[in-house]
């Protein structure tokens, strides 16, 4: 029997099925939410590398930009206020999603505060026991949290349920570890240190310009949020002092509603327009940050051929260790004068920035590394031995040609106390058993 002749539209493969749990903080416009942007880029790049992945995304509503051919979206209403969202875990709805009909080889969670609850429901009320890993782009570290009560302890206890949790920078990891030391013992800190792994948010290789603009306008760009945690007032003070010395430059702040100085411009446009405008800029300014996260604004500029002067701290050295750094306002003004006065030096630094992006910060390379780790987790997942019951399941599939997971569970008559995950792993390790490239898993026997 040749099953390819029976189901010609079905692609048989060793599918890796991933449940993805979100961290949504900007429901007002989901397409602009940082999590949505990251997961969209991750899935897109992972799909470029291989075609045997299926993602189950939990979302507050359907998201058009995430309608990939290998994505199933499940709507779970969520509170919009971040502290409330992080306290709300919808057990009944999550149990519905963790259906007897589905398989999950991995769980990728972006919200540590819910990870223990998710694992608790999954392991104790379903047949599933996959390994957990994930990514966290926001940490409730002191001096950054805007609300009265943070969720830092819940974040740490959740992260301890991960095999690995990616975060933006080593600086961010150090902040988390140092604050955790005030609550947790040494053994826990050692475990936490092993789980947390920096993963830099690189860029699409196609977005890096081939060559720099060698005759840019004398524009200093501050394309970060003009907020306190980005030290915007301090940046303006630097520009005020520079403007007293010279008046041959402008400052572009695209995220500022309106100019607050006569040398400022705040023009705005879509993403394509924004990139074109960056290419006209002379130099960028990356300020001190209270949080020490990854600066997408800086990589936006660098990939468009803009050299940046950056505050001298580890989170910017991770971003471009070959760049120019300032420790104080005086040094910042000196550097800005150097760039504005020496176009040859400016162009050399711009070319170095592009080379750095191409060699160090292509996001697809980061996704390839993550994919290797995902494969490792799948391989390490426990598989049953060649038991009589497992042989029965293989024979059922062979005789029927194909069976769904639900069909198999019903034949077995198992309750939730018997775990299916080790049997799925053994089936996927079997040389003749294949899954399909669809939302609902089916097990085929291929001769």
Where are these regions (language model features)?
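Active-site proximal beta-strand in glycosyltransferases
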Residues: 106-108, 121-144, 159, 166
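Conserved donor-binding/catalytic core segment of Leloir-type glycosyltransferases
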Residues: 16-21, 166, 203, 209-230, ...
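A charged, aromatic-enriched C-terminal amphipathic alpha-helix characteristic of glycosyltransferases
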Residues: 37, 343-382
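Acidic donor-binding loop of glycosyltransferase active sites
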Residues: 276-293, 306
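Short His-centered aromatic/hydrophobic patch
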Residues: 109-115
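Short hydrophobic beta-strand element within catalytic cores of glycosyltransferases
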Residues: 303, 307-310
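N-terminal subdomain of nucleotide-sugar transferases
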Residues: 1-64, 242
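A short, active-site helix/loop in glycosyltransferases that binds the activated sugar's phosphate group
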Residues: 153, 160-193
